[in-house]
């Protein structure tokens, strides 16, 4: 009975790997993390007013960042934004 359970577990893990591996290589991931260029602009939770750039799906656009929080789709310059996301 023990070998049957082991074989079942190996089969299950193999199928799970085959099913999930292509998703890990999809365009929504970059170096194992969700591609930040696809995230919406996020002002953050603080009240400061910093000019930042985010990728909107086509190009880089300005937005006002509050100074803390937010997500990875914020860049200090348009050039930095385009370098990271221009080919997204």
Swiss-Prot record:
GO MF terms held by the record: potassium channel regulator activity; serine-type endopeptidase inhibitor activity; toxin activity
The residue range of the signal peptide is 1-27
Q: Tell me the domain of life.
A: Eukaryota
Main localization is secreted
- Site Reactive bond for trypsin: give positions: 47-48
- Propeptide stretches are 28-33
User: Sorted alphabetically, which SMART domains does this protein's record hold?
Assistant: KU (SM00131)
Per UniProt, subcellular location reads as: Secreted
Spell out the PANTHER family in the cross-references.
BPTI_KUNITZ INHIBITOR DOMAIN-CONTAINING PROTEIN (PTHR10083:SF374), KUNITZ-TYPE PROTEASE INHIBITOR-RELATED (PTHR10083)
- The name under which this protein is listed is Kunitz-type kappaPI-theraphotoxin-Hs1b
Which species is this record about? Cyriopagopus schmidti (Chinese bird spider)
Q: What is the lineage of its organism?
A: Eukaryota, Metazoa, Ecdysozoa, Arthropoda, Chelicerata
């Amino acid at each position: 009975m023990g070998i049957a359970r082991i074989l079942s577990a190996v089969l299950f893990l193999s199928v799970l790997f085959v099913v999930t591996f292509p998703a890990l290589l999809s365009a929504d991931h970059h170096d194992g993390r969700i591609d930040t260029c696809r995230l919406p602009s996020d002002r953050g939770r603080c009240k400061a007013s910093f000019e930042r750039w985010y990728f909107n799906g086509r190009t880089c656009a300005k937005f006002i960042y509050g100074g803390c929080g937010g997500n990875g789709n914020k860049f200090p310059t348009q050039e930095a934004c385009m370098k990271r996301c221009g080919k997204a």
